[in-house]
């Protein structure tokens, strides 16, 4: 299994994060949006770096009160199926429990079966559908959720 160093980003990581965004999403975030997330105290952003210290993946989550909302899990194509997303999901959950969150949700494209499998593997359940949520191309989103409260007791 590949080992990743999981780090919190600094402003100097914005360009590398944008590279991952551009490789993974049809409508990527801008440098300004990424920089705002890095500075936002209610946003958790975790980077996965390979043995060469290259940023190959990241995950982001907003949280308010006891709820978290995963905005992105992005992995460069050459790093997929090498467990970077697993490491990021585990770290997000660990940090969520540490912050006292009891519930996490996310949206995922209906056609993104690898991501759906990843989320199910980590205990997420489909809770509903958002019609035409995604653009470029237009597609429904599955709403997936996970309760953490039982794990805190």
Map each language-model feature to its residues.
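Conserved acetyl-CoA-binding loop-helix of GNAT-fold acetyltransferases
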Residues: 75, 81-95, 113, 117-121
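Short coil/turn segments at alpha/beta junctions that flank glycine-rich nucleotide-binding fingerprints
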Residues: 82, 99-102
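Conserved catalytic-core motifs of GNAT/GCN5-like acyltransferases
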Residues: 107, 125-142
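Conserved active-site tyrosine of GNAT-family acetyltransferases
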Residues: 119, 124, 144
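Acetyl-CoA-dependent GNAT
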Residues: 2-78, 89-91, 95, 99, ...
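Conserved hydrophobic beta-strand within the GNAT/NAT acetyltransferase core sheet
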Residues: 70, 104-108
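Residue-level recognition of the GNAT/N-acetyltransferase active site
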Residues: 76, 80, 107-111, 136
């Amino acid at each position: 299994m590949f080992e990743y160093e999981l780090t919190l980003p600094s402003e100097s990581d914005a360009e590398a994060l944008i590279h991952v965004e551009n490789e993974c999403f049809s409508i990527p975030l801008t440098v300004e949006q990424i920089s705002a997330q890095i500075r936002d105290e209610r946003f958790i952003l975790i980077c996965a770096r390979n043995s060469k210290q290259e940023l190959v993946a990241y995950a982001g989550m907003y949280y308010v009160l006891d709820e978290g909302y995963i905005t992105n899990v992005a992995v460069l194509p050459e790093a997929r199926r090498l467990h970077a997303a697993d490491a990021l999901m585990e770290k997000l959950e660990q940090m969520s429990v540490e912050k006292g969150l009891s519930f996490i949700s996310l949206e995922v494209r209906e056609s993104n079966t690898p991501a759906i499998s990843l989320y199910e593997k980590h205990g997420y359940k489909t809770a509903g559908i958002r019609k035409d949520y995604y653009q470029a191309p237009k597609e429904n989103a599955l709403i997936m959720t996970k309760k953490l409260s039982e794990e805190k007791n």
